[in-house]
């Protein structure tokens, strides 16, 4: 097991903050945001507004090139809007440094670096991103819980680069969960998982979202998985929000415009499904 668990403190980490109980507004909010890549002739977004509330899972849906991952990068402060403001728990992201942002937002991207760390140490990074910080019993408990929730206990001493793509994806999600931030961003969190693991992982994320009152926002291509696990939806096409809101926002018309093909919502038993239809 890792030697990090026996380290002594040489630097005092910032105390964790939790403003969810003090703020009745959205956890994440974009207000009239515009963004353009350098030297691009056309902006990706103009006047985009968006909200994510505590205890809800929001799916960002759309074809490739719709602007979904760009929106996540803006919400995570990876990129900066050219106009408008983005807030987390009522505070402007633009006023925060990287450390402060990481106290509020955990982000699992599609392109994760794979340091030569054990699974345990990788998840521990969610608690202690600096090796000079001490590790408390609470930290160990949080890490152990995240490992158990993602069924990673058999792999704790394995190196991440020895794992399959799906197993690594679960490690990164566990690390983000261990951060215990009020916002969790996931870019295609199930892309490397088989159908069984997709549902199991999304159920874990769903349970954690509701139990800890986090705001979870994820980009996902599978509309039917989104309909099954998410509360709110943002449907995007070419940088424009076609529709957003609860399940009532996912209409036949909105889906058809978002995916540029005829689609309809069907109810089979208690399950809602998005089905392509003949034109």
Residue ranges and their predicted role:
Residues 61-63:
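The feature captures the beta-strand-to-loop junction immediately N-terminal to the Walker
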Residues 184-188:
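Catalytic Walker B motif of ABC-type/P-loop ATPase nucleotide-binding domains
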Residues 76:
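Helix-to-loop junction immediately C-terminal to a conserved catalytic motif
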Residues 17-30, 34-47, 97:
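A short, flexible loop at the N-terminus of ABC-type nucleotide-binding domains that lies
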Residues 159-163, 167:
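Conserved ABC ATPase signature
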Residues 137-155, 180:
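Conserved ABC ATPase "signature" region
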Residues 84-92, 101:
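Conserved ABC transporter NBD signature motif
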């Amino acid at each position: 097991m890792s030697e990090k668990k026996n380290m002594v403190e040489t630097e005092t980490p910032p105390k964790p903050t939790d403003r969810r109980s003090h703020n009745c507004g959205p956890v994440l909010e974009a207000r009239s945001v515009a963004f353009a890549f350098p030297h691009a002739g056309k902006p990706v977004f103009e006047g985009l507004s968006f909200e994510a509330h505590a205890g809800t899972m929001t799916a960002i849906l759309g074809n490739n090139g719709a602007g979904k991952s760009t929106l996540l990068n803006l919400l995570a402060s990876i990129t900066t809007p050219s106009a408008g403001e983005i807030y987390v728990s009522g505070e402007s992201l633009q006023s925060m440094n990287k450390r402060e942002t990481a106290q509020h937002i955990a982000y699992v991207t599609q392109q994760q670096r794979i340091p030569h760390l054990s699974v345990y140490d990788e998840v521990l990074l969610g608690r202690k991103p600096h090796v000079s910080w001490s590790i408390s019993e609470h930290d160990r408990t949080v890490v152990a819980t995240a490992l158990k929730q993602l069924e990673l206990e058999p792999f704790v001493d394995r190196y991440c680069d020895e794992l399959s793509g799906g197993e690594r994806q679960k490690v990164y999600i566990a690390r983000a969960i261990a951060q215990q931030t009020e916002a969790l961003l996931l870019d295609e969190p199930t892309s490397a998982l088989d159908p069984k693991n997709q549902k199991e992982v999304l159920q874990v994320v769903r349970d954690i979202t509701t139990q800890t009152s986090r705001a979870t926002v994820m980009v996902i291509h599978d509309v039917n998985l989104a309909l099954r696990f998410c509360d709110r939806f943002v449907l995007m096409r070419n940088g424009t929000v076609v529709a957003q809101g609860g399940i009532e926002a996912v209409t036949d018309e909105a889906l058809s415009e978002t995916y540029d093909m005829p689609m309809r919502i069907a109810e089979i038993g208690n399950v809602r499904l998005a089905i392509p239809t003949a034109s």
